[in-house]
Amino acid sequence: MPLSLAKSGPKPYLWDMIADSGRSVAFTGHRTYDGTAAESLSAAVERLYGRGFRTFLSGMAVGFDLAAAEVVLTLRAAHPDVRLVAVVPFRGQEERFSPADRVRFLRAVSAADEVEVLAGGYRRGCYAVRNDFLVDRAALVVAWYDGSPGGTRYTLRRALARGREVWNLHPSGGGLAIRPVQPALF
């Protein structure tokens, strides 16, 4: 079942009208994420809530993005002031997912407080547009980055260039000038 949220005409994103990016967190990570940092991710989101962050943006890709969205929804069950913003790069993205991941995606999108669909269909560069949207609307980025090239590296470099705080939950630290957040710190 394709995403059926319509966005017509060149109007400002709802996000731009209501959100405070200074109190927002974005997630970025590899699609190959297998859940190994589930405890660290949950602890990080709880810690960020304790620091006053209430809005969490997920790029809604398979892997770390969906896992992060699910953690935020769990936190929201205990703290109704938490908001999940599902940032979907293009309409129909979920059609490229496995059946199990499609179900997870649709469940998270349906439960999100806000959904931003950035393009009517796939086009070259749409993932970079999504990544820019995430970084530009967050004060802090939580990552699962192992040092490999790709969209996660691009997103973290953009975040660092824009002075965003970055937490990398991957135990290797990923090789960028960011420190990994160790589970023991939580």
Where are these regions (language model features)?
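N-terminal amphipathic/basic-hydrophobic helices that include classical n-h-c signal peptides
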Residues: 1-16
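Acidic/glycine-enriched connector segments
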Residues: 12-186
